[in-house]
């Protein structure tokens, strides 16, 4: 949310972040003038993701402004369709319109290669557009894996993102759109849909673009689309996705003509909930009357995802917290079955947690772990200033009432997350203009990582907390650090015999010989590329690791000291060629 760059919620962002930093935020291809970032020390690793009482978090059913008394949003929508001024279409048809053509992954992500990440980019225009300069910023993310347990809708993999529009500076949150994209694996096509609010009556239907909106998060479930907006939850019905019959700057219906501010499609709201009653909102101070307002004392929906591990599923929301905040931020679970059209009773949360992280932007769960996009700890993988909007973000993980830990770095200002129960992949996207990507990864891929312990030196193999290609793989005192853990991924040699890629848990790089055949050649880490010099045979009886390319054994030579580089040598049965692979750190 450009570090939730919004003028709207006092305390939601610090002056240090509003003033930005040396952000490589491109606006129309030029670099934005920014100020120096204030140094803030962040050290959240090990803090507890703890349960808290949920009864105080409530969503109240609210009216949709502009609908005539005695009418409903549904009746207005049906009236517009009956007049023939709009045409109902499917999400798939929007995606397949090819209004925009996405690109393969085009920017550096910072994601650890261990987690087998992939993804795509928007087209160049949507990559660079900015809500700070007459354009758009992306926020929420959902997909067909949320909509249907099969992972597809009408047999297709579809993805959606919310965007909010701004004119310049603080004049943002003017309107919102969603993008509907289909990915076939080789082609990514999408279209933009304006979010609109119905008004008037069945006999005199009208609509206008939704304003006062940041569109923080989004969940697609069945035919319903839930859009989080800070202090508000908006609901849309995708069975009433409209194609308008004219393209102009106007929004609404005039005679027999419908238009949606230069959009081909519009999606009307059918219901809304708020963290306050109408009386509470109307009597609030002027600066707190926005639909987006939340201050932490009440439910704050700054992120939204779907948990399909329960039946029925649960909505999961998260509250944003800036770099300087001290208190934890709320992660709340909501009963989706009670949130819909025609609601007359408040809906209470079913569970809640305190997330001890800075800059929460997204949250999702696989039913066991919660995944949170937030600022990295200071100096994690050389992230010196986590509050710098140009800095990598991190995905954190935790089980309820357990400590938080970093899973991986992610692109700067990573926003909402979405977990696919059909594929086991965690999806996300970031908002930094000129650096935007949509990505997915396998978050549990490193769960079976193991220590590689030398029988001669009694030391563990590691990478010295480096992430760069060609850095030496060394031995060090076994201390349980992440860079001493290795993922042994099964593969085959050229003859179909079992072999392994050995991938470092910390760097995500593979252990290899640098395509060398020489005795004494030092082992290095390198981006895994499936080359034969990254493949290893392991003999369970002799405990030898033999490189498939060179045929040489992994060893130490005569070196038994901390920091010495691992080498390859003609296999000779020496003790320094014996390696113990263990799930637990050796005790020495």
Placement of each model-derived feature along the sequence:
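Blade-loop segments of beta-propeller domains
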Residues: 124-151, 161-219
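Extracellular glycan-recognition/adhesion modules and their associated mucin-like linkers
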Residues: 369, 445-469, 485-518, 535-561, ...
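Surface-exposed loop and turn segments in beta-propeller and other repeat-based domains
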Residues: 93-134, 188-209, 248-297, 343-356, ...
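Short loop/turn segments immediately following beta-strands, especially the blade-tip
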Residues: 182-186, 237-258, 328-344, 441-445
């Amino acid at each position: 949310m450009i570090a939730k760059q919004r003028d709207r919620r006092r305390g939601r962002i610090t002056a240090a972040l509003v003033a930005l930093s040396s952000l490589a935020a491109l606006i129309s291809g030029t670099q934005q003038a920014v100020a120096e970032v204030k140094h803030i020390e962040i050290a959240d690793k090990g803090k507890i993701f703890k349960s808290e009482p949920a009864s105080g978090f409530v969503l109240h059913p609210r009216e949709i402004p502009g609908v005539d008394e005695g009418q409903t949003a549904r009746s207005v929508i049906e009236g517009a369709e009956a007049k023939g001024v709009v045409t109902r279409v499917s999400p798939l048809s929007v995606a397949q319109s090819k209004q925009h053509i996405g690109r393969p992954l085009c920017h550096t992500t910072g994601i650890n290669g261990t987690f087998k990440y992939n993804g795509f980019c928007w087209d160049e225009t949507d990559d660079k557009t900015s809500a700070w300069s007459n354009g758009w910023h992306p926020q929420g993310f959902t997909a067909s894996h949320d909509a249907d347990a099969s992972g597809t809708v009408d047999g297709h993999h579809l993805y959606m993102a919310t965007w909010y529009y701004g004119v310049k500076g603080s004049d943002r949150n003017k309107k919102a759109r969603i993008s509907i994209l289909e990915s076939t694996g080789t082609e990514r096509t999408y279209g933009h849909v304006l979010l609109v609010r119905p008004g008037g009556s069945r006999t005199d239907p009208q609509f206008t673009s939704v304003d006062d909106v940041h569109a923080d998060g989004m969940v697609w479930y069945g035919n319903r689309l839930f859009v989080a907006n800070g202090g508000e939850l908006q609901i849309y019905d995708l069975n009433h996705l409209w194609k308008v019959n004219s393209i102009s700057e106007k929004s609404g219906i005039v005679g027999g003509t419908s238009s949606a501010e230069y959009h081909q499609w519009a999606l009307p709201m059918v219901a809304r909930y708020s963290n306050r009653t109408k009386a509470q909102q109307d009597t609030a101070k002027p600066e707190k009357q926005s639909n987006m307002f939340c201050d932490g004392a009440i439910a704050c929906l700054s992120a939204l995802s779907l948990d399909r591990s329960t039946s029925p599923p649960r909505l999961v929301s998260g509250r944003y917290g800036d770099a300087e905040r001290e208190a934890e931020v709320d992660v709340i679970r909501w009963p989706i079955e009670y949130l819909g059209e025609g609601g007359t009773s408040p809906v209470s949360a079913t569970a809640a947690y305190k997330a001890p992280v800075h800059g929460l932007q997204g949250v999702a769960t696989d039913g066991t772990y919660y995944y949170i996009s937030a600022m990295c700890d200071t100096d994690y993988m050389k992230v010196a200033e986590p509050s710098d909007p140009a800095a990598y973000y991190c995905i954190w993980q935790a089980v309820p009432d357990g400590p938080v830990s970093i899973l991986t770095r992610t692109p700067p200002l990573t926003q909402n997350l979405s977990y696919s129960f059909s594929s086991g992949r965690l999806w996300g996207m970031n908002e930094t203009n000129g650096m935007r990507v949509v990505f997915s990864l396998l978050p549990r891929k490193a769960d079976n990582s193991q220590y590689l312990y030398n029988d001669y030196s009694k030391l563990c193999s590691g990478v010295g907390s480096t992430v760069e290609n060609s850095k030496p793989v060394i031995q060090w005192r076994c201390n349980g650090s992440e860079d001493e853990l290795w993922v042994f991924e099964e593969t085959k040699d050229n003859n179909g015999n079992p072999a392994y890629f050995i991938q470092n848990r910390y760097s995500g790089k593979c252990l290899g010989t640098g395509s060398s055949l020489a005795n004494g050649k030092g082992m290095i880490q390198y981006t895994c590329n499936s080359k034969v010099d990254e493949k290893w045979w392991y003999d369970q009886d002799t405990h030898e690791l033999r490189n498939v390319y060179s045929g040489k054994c992994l060893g130490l030579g005569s070196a038994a000291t901390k920091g010495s580089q691992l080498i390859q040598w003609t296999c000779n049965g020496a003790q320094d060629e014996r390696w113990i692979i263990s799930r637990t750190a050796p005790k020495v």
